[in-house]
């Protein structure tokens, strides 16, 4: 039995290539729409917050700013999860990379979702990126901006490639 299994594995092989993360155009479009909806939802949340957050509904024991950041993180995490689900559904269960992830051989479905779908919001100690320049994370963005991209949301995937600002946010 062992010899037969080794023989099958040797003849068939079990490798993954860059084309295993290929998505059809409709999947890429759907992921792009999900990321855009997430960014729009963050903008709407920032609009609700206003300039000082005095009328913003807070959670018990949290300041308005802490509540805002938690809400934004939930929105962006949901967008990442949705785009990952789209990528997973289009990759299919017969894909070698998916088989490796689901069998536990190497990687995970989260890794595949980041390679094919969307990377999402990088976090430092459970929070969005905060440090960098004075009142902003990168000099590319206006001061005191709290939008999705301004605080590090990465809508691209590793396969599609990253913008320079996205690359810096992940480093």
What are these regions (language model features)?
Residues 2-171:
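Append "with occasional cross-activation on large, charged helical scaffolds in nucleic-acid assemblies
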